[in-house]
Structures are given as structure tokens and as C-alpha cells.
């Protein structure tokens, strides 16, 4: 069974057009994965749909790395 991180990694890979093997918890969405603000908003909406959660603007403003998004998803799915 796929973990939250596995599912999120696959979605991030697809959205950012980056190989899954390059997506590690320390990767910064903007600096390392080349996301722009529109990519980031679209990714957050995709993750909300996939995990059936709703992130606040404050939550998302604190997300900088892949690890941050993993932690946020886990916070809302527990």
C-alpha cells in the first residue's frame, strides 16, 4: 500500500515534471524543483483533492520544502 509520501511524491513529480527519484524531503519547491507561484497553487489544489483535505493560506505560506508538504498532509489526514 502506498504511503502518504509515496502518493504525494508521485503527484509532485507529475506536476513539476521532475523524476520521482529527485524528490526528497529537503528539496525546495521554488529553488530546487523550479516551481513558480501558479505551479505551487495548482499543486496544492491537486494535493487537497487527492487527500481530501483543505489547507489554509497560512499553512501554505509556511511550506517551502517537500518535507513541509508531507508534514502538512499528515497533519490533516490523522
Label every model-predicted segment:
Residues 2-35, 39, 43-45, 50-78:
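Phosphopantetheine-dependent thiolation modules in NRPS/PKS and related acyl-activating systems
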Amino acid at each position: 500500500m502506498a504511503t502518504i509520501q509515496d502518493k504525494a511524491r508521485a503527484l509532485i513529480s507529475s506536476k513539476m515534471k521532475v523524476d520521482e527519484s529527485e524528490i526528497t524531503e529537503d528539496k525546495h519547491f521554488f529553488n530546487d524543483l523550479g516551481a513558480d507561484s501558479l505551479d505551487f497553487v495548482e499543486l496544492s489544489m491537486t494535493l487537497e483533492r487527492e487527500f481530501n483535505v483543505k489547507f489554509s493560506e497560512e499553512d501554505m505560506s509556511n511550506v517551502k520544502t517537500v518535507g513541509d508538504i508531507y508534514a502538512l498532509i499528515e497533519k490533516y489526514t490523522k
